[in-house]
Every structure is written in structure tokens, then in C-alpha cells.
Amino acid sequence: MIKLKRILTEAMGDCYQAAGRLIMGHTGKGKLVHGMVNGQGSLKGIRFGHAWVEVGSKVLDHSNGKKKSIPKKLYYAMGRINPKECKYYKYKDAAKFMLDKGHWGPWEMSGGVVMAEEIPDAKGEVGKKNQRIPKDILDKLSD
């Protein structure tokens, strides 16, 4: 059974790093995506920045130690993702941002939390942003 709900209810996230590493293995195909998702469960009513990789009609979400391959239509429906609020990057574009910015993302959107009520303290690090990329990985990107 698909456990996308579990991904969307995780309090701590490594999605930008996980998706960034994943796109590095899909140099000729696929897109890195930074977008806004709507949380479920304890994160219901909270919209937050998230990252994943799309290859054809599949979404690959390796955040929080998971290795999910989910049909894109289902992923977008469950996360109530608006494609107009997403940024899509081919490998070369993602690699350029990684080199220029020195972190996994987000690069062109805030990736911040958008909601009407306060975030519980335990949920304060949804989708950790601007995690630095180790030098050895940056060196591989510049080759």
C-alpha cells in the first residue's frame, strides 16, 4: 500500500537534500521539483515547501529515508499540489543552482510554511531549507 500520507505527515524533513541527490543519478531524464504541498494528519492545514523527482509519469520521493515511487497524478492529488506553484529543473539546471548557491534548495521559492494558525514547536523544521552541499559533491557537479 502506498504510504504517501506518512511522507506528508513527517515533522522533520530532508526532502531537498534527498531529491537533490536523487536527480544527480538521473542526468539524462527526470526533473527535480520544488513545490508546495498540503500536509496531512498532524500537519493538516499546513502548506510547506517540499522536493521530489519526476521521471515520466512517476514521482520519486526519497525523503525521510523512504524510497517511494508513486504515480504523479496520485501524488499531486494527495498533496493537493498546484503545478503553477512548482519549480521544475532539468539535471543541468539543478546542478547549476547547486553549484551557484551551495545548498540543496529551495532556490527560487521560499519553501516556507504557509498557514493561518501557528505551527506547533515540534513541527518547526518541516522541509529543512538551505542545507549546505558537501564540497566533494559540488566538485562532482562541476566536472
Label each PLM-derived region with a short phrase:
Residues 1-7:
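Enriched but not universal
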